[in-house]
């Protein structure tokens, strides 16, 4: 679950009844995931490299609806990908008591649920402790992806994410979209583009909402075969 062999979840490339490319996703704990922004970029590059599409721009069906993707360079199997995230929404600030302390969250949706809280020191944020507690919080009966965000400059934020079903991950594309929109809501972002720095790299969020797109890299790190018993 770093930069080599391993993963935060499983993505299967399939085709729906209309022969469209389809993304099926499972989290690390085996639960189904409705949408994964980073996974969508990886699936797009995988589809290109393995001959499932000849197009530079195409649709991928997800459990959250169709998503348009665009391969931005001439590389095969690696390079930047732009993904349309659909409509992303954020609600007003709300106070939530977690493990005896009150946290101010902006809750949003990017095809899956997110709760964003802003901190002054991201490195010291209690990501694992609070993120895990939020998964059984009565206000989030289905669990929630939790983003800890620090504003670091003009139209630039840093982010750490505790993903429901996977724990803390190095990056979260849908979380970056919601975090950028939440940062715009509180005045930390005012431009058309926002840069979101994650432990796994930097993503570019394009748009002012509700429709957003994300640009970021996707590259192959390992090929293998696994024999599954029936």
Task: State where each predicted segment sits.
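A glycine-rich beta-to-alpha transition motif near the start of alpha/beta enzyme domains, typified by
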Residues: 1-77, 115-230
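Short acidic-hydrophobic surface loop/beta-edge motif
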Residues: 58-60, 93-100, 106-108, 194-196
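Zinc-dependent deaminase
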Residues: 63, 86-91
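Short, solvent-exposed secondary-structure boundary/capping segments
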Residues: 77-85
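Glycine-rich beta-alpha junction loops
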Residues: 87-89, 110-114, 218
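Short, charged/polar, Gly/Pro-enriched secondary-structure boundary elements
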Residues: 89-93, 221-223
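Internal active-site segments that recognize and position negatively charged phosphoryl groups
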Residues: 96-124
